């Protein structure tokens, strides 16, 4: 687990992963970005399910725009769009039913933003991230800080069978 300042520093690396930069929300660019993102947000909410909206977590160095009592950035809009597309494709049904516990597998989990988004919507799901070790370290640090009471599991090559042991109790798994 990390403190808010450390996670904010780690989020700076997120711009290389997702292209979203804190600097776009300050200074000269801020108004242009705000207009574009507000327009995009309203369009997405018009066509998507508002129940799938999750605010950007401000507590850990989150950044973005405040509008209509929501806090968001480009990643938030992307995550909302993906959640709506999954919903439209009827792929979220399994996550709404609590038994058996469903697993979502994200390949190349980035900095953990979508994992946070998804687990906020579906806390009883198991979220598996497979990625290179550097990304696993980044996403695990972020998620362990946001979800301090969650159960985490890391793949151990010396004991691969242990990874699946008591799978129904795991919130986040990394391999």
Predicted regions: what they are:
Residues 136-137:
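Short alpha-helix immediately C-terminal to the canonical SAM-binding loop
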Residues 142-175:
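S-adenosyl-L-methionine
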């Amino acid at each position: 687990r990390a403190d808010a300042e450390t996670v904010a520093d780690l989020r700076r690396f997120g711009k290389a992963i997702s292209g979203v930069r804190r600097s776009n929300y300050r200074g000269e660019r801020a108004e242009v970005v705000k207009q574009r993102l507000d327009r995009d947000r309203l369009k997405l909410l018009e066509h998507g399910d508002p129940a799938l909206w999750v605010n950007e977590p401000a507590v850990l160095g989150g950044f973005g725009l405040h509008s209509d009592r929501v806090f968001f950035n480009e990643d938030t809009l992307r995550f909302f769009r993906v959640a709506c597309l999954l919903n439209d494709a009827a792929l979220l049904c399994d996550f709404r039913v609590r038994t058996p516990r469903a697993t979502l597998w994200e390949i190349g989990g980035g900095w953990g933003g979508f994992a946070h988004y998804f687990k906020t919507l579906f806390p009883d799901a198991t979220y598996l991230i497979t990625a290179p070790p550097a990304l696993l370290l980044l996403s695990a640090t972020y998620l362990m800080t946001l979800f301090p009471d969650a159960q985490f599991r890391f793949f151990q090559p010396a004991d691969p069978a242990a990874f699946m042991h008591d799978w129904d109790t795991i919130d986040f798994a990394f391999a």
